[in-house]
């Protein structure tokens, strides 16, 4: 199914397509293929439908170890596509300090520190010159705010004043700087599969991540990009079920190549 125009998305209210809504027009099926989750374009005054020369930005979203890097690597050698990986190396080394590791070990103390730097570095990702017609980004400034800052606050790890300041800064960025995106690809993975993959790749900072953390991140992603009950999405959303093994995931990426890389498929209805 092709995406509706961004203008029509702005006019529609988000509708539930999450688990538990079976029988409704937006309910999810149990198949392995992709599904389109209708979203409200936001902010609505950034409709670029008639800007034919605009370069396109696609954000690959998902939980920790959901397969984002694999997806980006799959498309990295495609002509006219550039890839921006999440700037994790920066988060691991700020003048010799590792705020990512500090946050995982003591989120109450270091949550604001890390998320302040994440917001800065993701802003840099969004605003750096784009050289190719299509840019694929690992996550976005939106998920930094709507998923990871939100999780710290809801979990009681971030004081309300820190949350308010980060939120106000984020809102100012969105109002005054072009950080718009054209499509969000959500790699929908169960926390149990993410936990298995996380343990297999054995990254140092991730050794202390509990299953409960992955469940919390998963719930927020579902609220944001599937149910539409958290925050409005920044762009239309393509959901790909991503619990499969590597071979199957590569097949799904190939099957969805045109949907992910072709702007015309994002702007016109079925």
Swiss-Prot record:
Found in most tissues; highly expressed in liver. Its EC number is 2.7.1.21, 2.7.1.74, 2.7.1.-. Pfam families: dNK. It catalyses: thymidine + ATP = dTMP + ADP + H(+); 2'-deoxycytidine + ATP = dCMP + ADP + H(+); 2'-deoxyuridine + ATP = dUMP + ADP + H(+). Transmembrane segments: none annotated. GO terms for molecular function: ATP binding; deoxycytidine kinase activity; thymidine kinase activity. GO terms for cellular component: mitochondrial inner membrane; mitochondrion. The active site is at 138 (proton acceptor). InterPro entries: DCK/DGK (IPR002624), Deoxyribonucleoside_kinase (IPR050566), DNK_dom (IPR031314), P-loop_NTPase (IPR027417). Keywords: ATP-binding, DNA synthesis, Kinase, Mitochondrion, Nucleotide-binding, Transferase, Transit peptide. Residues 1-38 form a transit peptide. Residues 1-54 are annotated as: Disordered. ATP binds at residues 62-70. It is found in: Mitochondrion. It comes from the Eukaryota. Gene3D superfamilies: P-loop containing nucleotide triphosphate hydrolases. Residues 42-54 have a biased composition (Basic and acidic residues). GO terms for biological process: deoxyribonucleotide metabolic process; DNA biosynthetic process; mitochondrial DNA metabolic process; mitochondrial DNA replication. Residues 13-34 have a biased composition (Low complexity). Belongs to the DCK/DGK family. Phosphorylates thymidine, deoxycytidine, and deoxyuridine in the mitochondrial matrix. In non-replicating cells, where cytosolic dNTP synthesis is down-regulated, mtDNA synthesis depends solely on TK2 and DGUOK. PANTHER family: DEOXYNUCLEOSIDE KINASE (PTHR10513), THYMIDINE KINASE 2, MITOCHONDRIAL (PTHR10513:SF24). Homodimer. This is Thymidine kinase 2, mitochondrial. It comes from Mus musculus (Mouse).
